[in-house]
Amino acid sequence: MKDYNINIFYSEEDEGYIADIPDLKFCSAFGSTPEEALKELQIAKAAWIEAAHAEGIPVPPPR
């Protein structure tokens, strides 16, 4: 099963790592390490999908 592409990058401004899923608009998370940002992103992804279902918003498939 295919999963969403994830970007992780260091933000000088935030002094930490940001992880995001481009296919899920505004789905991102912050962490002090790349691993922490990824862990937080998994939580954010689940919440994003749950909220989309609750609002009747289609969830785009992974590309």
Which residues are covered by each model-predicted region?
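Flexible, active-site-adjacent loop/turn segments at secondary-structure boundaries
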Residues: P22, S28, I57
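A short, exposed loop/beta-hairpin motif centered on an aromatic-Gly-Thr core
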Residues: K25-E36
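Short glycine/serine/threonine-biased micro-segments
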Residues: D14, A29, A54
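Short, charged, surface-exposed hinge/linker loops at domain edges
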Residues: M1-N5, E35, K39-R63
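N-terminal segment of the canonical double-stranded RNA-binding domain
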Residues: M1-E15, D20
